[in-house]
């Protein structure tokens, strides 16, 4: 909202229903590389500071997806530090319910005792990182099956489009 001033329109047009418009004012606009670029430039110094303060952890980020890898206690401390930096310096707010902890070897109880916030989901099977699966063979297989199912549904929608131009 601050950068664009107005909500963006997301328009759907479906046979028998007509045109439907949904207003969206959250995050950068889809396809707006400028907004994403500015966001990345803004958080980069904070991510670098976090990495410098926690040298035994690896901090990976792509836009607003931040991943902290390391021993449970240090990773939990780094997460809390990231929450502080993001809130104090950018007036942002992390949503624990949108965060995940992947621990292939340690139980949920162990990572909770290390300081992981209670609102963060814990998985010992796997998680999604930058759009792809990371985890057990079963997790990756189920992830791939889900993608195939989604693409199959997308093809059903595309098939209903009246022109080839609208399909691209």
Positions of the model-derived regions?
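Nucleic-acid-interacting cores, centered on viral/eukaryotic replication and modification enzymes
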Residues: 1-168
């Amino acid at each position: 909202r601050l950068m664009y001033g107005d909500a963006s329109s997301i328009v759907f047009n479906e046979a028998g229903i007509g045109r439907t418009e949904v207003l969206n004012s959250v995050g950068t606009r889809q396809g707006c590389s400028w907004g994403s670029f500015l966001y990345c430039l803004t958080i980069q110094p904070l991510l670098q500071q976090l990495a410098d303060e926690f040298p035994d952890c690896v901090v990976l980020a792509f836009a607003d997806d931040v991943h902290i890898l390391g021993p449970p206690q240090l990773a939990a401390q780094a997460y809390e530090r990231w929450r502080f930096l993001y809130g104090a310096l950018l007036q942002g707010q992390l949503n624990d319910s949108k965060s995940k902890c992947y621990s292939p070897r340690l139980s949920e109880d162990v990572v909770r005792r290390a300081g992981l916030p209670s609102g963060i989901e814990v998985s010992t099977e796997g998680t999604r990182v930058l759009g792809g699966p990371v985890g057990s063979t079963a997790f990756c297989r189920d992830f791939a099956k889900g993608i195939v199912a989604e693409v199959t549904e997308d093809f059903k929608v595309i098939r209903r489009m009246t022109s080839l131009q609208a399909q691209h």
